[in-house]
Amino acid sequence: YHHLLLPPFAYSHCHIYGEGVYAPEVENKEEIFSLFVKAITDELTHKLCLFIEISDLSSKMFGYAKLRENGYFPIQWQKIHNSLHSKSPYERLPQKLRDKLSIAEQRGAKAEIVNSDSKELQQAVKLMRHYFRLKPRRTVRNSKLFEHLATSKQCKIFATKYKNRVIGTCVCFFFGGNAYMWQLASLRKSFMMLYPASYTVWSALKYAHEQGFAHMYFLDAGLPFKRNPMREFILNFGGKQVAEYRWFRIQIPWIGKFMDWFYNE
């Protein structure tokens, strides 16, 4: 949940990942999820949140009817995941990408997992804040969040360094036998010949494979346009596309109805 100022406008946006975690004996997950959706929608409506986004549900049709009842509309989205169990991630890389990674290493690029009190973490947060400054849906505001995440056993923050400077970073979560990449940012233009984005993603994939995780899911592969450089970049690592719904609720009713008609008629 974050606020964004785009003069002369200011708005709030909330992004919810997944339907939550339930005890193994729970059978009525969709009913519980519907209560959560109603409660969070009412709360954010009072806070004048411009739009709410829900993504990465466990199945495409999970909660469909309940989300519709609460004023949400779906947009077809492409979800990408890499399998880490049948082959090593290196075997899935095309030769061109292998060469890029080799060149980056030869030129001095190194990847590491950063600690909560390290200068590398502060550099990584600064890099993400700069990288996402013109991307309203991915705004990075508070470094305290990342300091907290860096202490969690379920999260790792990777940093690609060159001459003691962080030139690429990503944030990954680990849960239920799978890995999830949340944020990815790099200085790909300033350090083009070091391929910082590629090296950062590769470092996270390699770590997840070495730790025995089955899949790496990319939580945001970009907007669902026919030509999407971010999606093509991620697919280059040997991943697969799976269609899913991403749900939205817009505070202004007529805009929400128009968007629903535009994407679903």
Which residue stretches match the model-derived regions?
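Short, polar/flexible loop-turn hinges at active-site or ligand-entry regions and domain interfaces
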Residues: A23-E30, K87-R92
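Divalent metal-dependent hydrolysis catalytic cores, especially in the metallo-beta-lactamase
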Residues: L48-D56
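A conserved beta-strand-loop-helix scaffold within acyl/acetyltransferase catalytic domains
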Residues: Y1-L5, D56-M193, L223
